């Protein structure tokens, strides 16, 4: 991961002098030098090991921090400057995330799918009230959690999650949270990836047929 302040991060990596991968270790390069990973008094390369959980699952950038998910907790990584450079703070414990693509950021807030509920982080970790909780989690293929894909649709104040229903090996359903109106809706569609509009005219989604599809697109 490349952070905005021009550090490169490696999650779940080997320590210096070791070839053994540590699933809870985070390392970062020197600022402005992606090739320098050995800490010294003259650079800002370094590392930190998280303590809650057994492996790092994923991480997502916000404006001020890197939200990092282990298999049982959530950490906030923030830039402190020398000599510590980066520090970690536990912001949620006994909290799950189903896969590395199950979190998305919308309007500065991070939303994600856990193994039995949905969450958000806006400076503090909260459980989302979800009218569709039983509909989603009673009919989801837990063996295919890694296929879950979250994406924002900020033009409509939405966060989408694409997932496999219990009898499917491919994403065939979606659930949407409208964070302004605080309502949920659902449907059936297969998407493997998602990119919000940003500089594009419309958000786009990828399919299992290796095609890119425009969404929120009016014809005529």
Label each PLM-derived region with a short phrase.
Residues 22-34, 173-181:
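Beta-propeller blade signature
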Residues 32-48:
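A short, charged helix-loop
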Residues 17-20:
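Intrinsic low-complexity, repeat-rich intrinsically disordered segments enriched
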Residues 26, 37, 56-57:
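A broad "ordered helical/assembly scaffold" signature
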Residues 7, 15, 51-220:
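Beta-sheet-dominated scaffold domains
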